UniProtKB/Swiss-Prot annotation:
Its main location: plastid. This is Cytochrome b6-f complex subunit 7. The keyword Electron transport applies. The lineage of its organism: Eukaryota, Sar, Stramenopiles, Ochrophyta, Bacillariophyta. InterPro entries: PetM_cyt_b6/f_cplx_su7. One of its GO terms (biological process) is photosynthesis. Keywords: Chloroplast, Electron transport, Membrane, Photosynthesis, Plastid, Thylakoid, Transmembrane, Transmembrane helix, Transport.
């Protein structure tokens, strides 16, 4: 977290938290979608 604040000194914690949540939700959605495709493909 401190490393991110050093790279982006202008970004406050709310923006960083929102970005991390959106990024993790996207990764979760992609992995879930690929899992469903694999199950349906079998």
């Amino acid at each position: 977290m401190e490393l991110i604040k050093q790279i982006f000194p202008f970004a406050n914690s709310e923006i960083i938290t929102a970005a991390v949540v959106c990024f993790s939700m996207t990764l979760f959605g992609l992995s879930l979608g690929f899992g469903l495709l694999k199950v349906q493909g079998e």
